[in-house]
Amino acid sequence: MQSDELQIPPWESLAEGLGFSNADEEYWWTVFGQPLNKLMDWADYSTSEKYRVLAFIHRYVIPTCGPRPKPNGDQYWDTFMGFDHTPIQVSINFYNSKATVRTGNIPISEASGTTEDPINQKASLDTIASQRHLVPGHNLRLFKHFTDAFFIPNEEANILNAELENRTIAMQAVQCMLSYDFPYRQIQTKVAICPMWKSMQVKRPMGDLMISSIKDLGIDAADYMKSLKVIEDFINSEKAVQSGAYAIFFAFDTMLTDDYQRTRVKIYFATQSTAFNNMVDIFTLGGRLDGPEMQRATKELRKLWMSTMAIPDGLRDDETLPKSPLPCAGVIFNFEIWPGADKPNPKIYLPCAYYGKDDLDIADGMDSFFKDQGWSKSFHSYKDNYIKAFVKDGKVMCRHHDISFSYKGQGAYITAYYKPELSEYADPSVWAPKLFKA
């Protein structure tokens, strides 16, 4: 009896002990808690850390996932966080001989899409407010500043929403996404805001709005200005026009261990161009980021690009990949600004969901890349761990959505982002027959 109890994974044990307020939470726990548990197994988290992370997800994230999908599989609130509107993701970061688990989700409620909350803003406000007491450093000054700048009163939002005929744009216009990093005994919360609705309302470019909102912090923005100027110069450059790069959203930390003025600010760009030369142009902000470290970074980026993307034989660096039919296919970048830094740190998100190889071939490519980096921890055996975590009876349960790359110090900084295949996780009686009854 005791040995059977020891085999119960933390996600299942917590569900038995804590239960759920409704069937929607039960559904989201099944499709979110389980792959997260598997990812923590991969990252060698201790049992106590698994319970800590999962308890946080159970209390603060699962209730914000909103109603479960409709019987036909459609999401209650369509959003392009993932290509099929899945509003959750799990991820694992590899850097400096460590593996760190992360999550991301777009808070949703029953009011989302109604006249009470037409563009889905309320759930994010409620979620951040509920977490305020978790750590002394959870200062909401920046959150209030940016939501005041970009969240829109319901009366005005209802008018904007009614006037917008292109619903693809509406799904891209994510007002707020929350993500969480879980290093040892810590929780780091990041908020991402897309000012697309505000841009449509005031008829100003999103990049202009983002830069202005950061400058509007006044004295609190002083330490960001050097790096911000580099990004602003690129936004207004011919290189940005040629590469099709445009600012799409920005992010900042809220849950800090020290003063809010030490937060990072990240500005994200997107492009639909997939030529490798174009990737390098944007990654270097049109050559504004240079030097020996950047040369090493672009060399390693090429290796990862070749290892994971479905590149036709003979494709030149100045040629684009065959176009994806998916409406939001493209490449994302972010530029991380630290207070006092002269230049931002670049990151690129390789679009596996749109232009990547098959998942197991991506896993092979990641193995090759990791070996080339000299990484040899147990969690660096990428394909073996990926199969153990996310392949069951020959079916892929979590697909690669993106793989991000940046370069810090002397090494690559890699994060793999996964989209749970909800239809594979959705039958609780199959996945946890002892817990959920058919």
Swiss-Prot record:
GO terms for molecular function: prenyltransferase activity. One of its GO terms (biological process) is paxilline biosynthetic process. Optimum pH is 8.0. It comes from the Eukaryota. The keyword rRNA processing does not apply. The keyword Transferase applies. Pfam families: Trp_DMAT. L-tryptophan binds at F80, M81. Optimum temperature is 37 degrees Celsius. Belongs to the tryptophan dimethylallyltransferase family. Indole diterpene prenyltransferase; part of the gene cluster that mediates the biosynthesis of paxilline, a mycotoxin that acts as an inhibitor of mammalian maxi-K channels. PaxG, the geranylgeranyl diphosphate (GGPP) synthase is proposed to catalyze the first step in paxilline biosynthesis. Condensation of indole-3-glycerol phosphate with GGPP by paxC then forms 3-geranylgeranylindole (3-GGI), followed by epoxidation and cyclization of this intermediate (by paxM and paxB) to form paspaline. This is Indole diterpene prenyltransferase paxD. It comes from Penicillium paxilli.
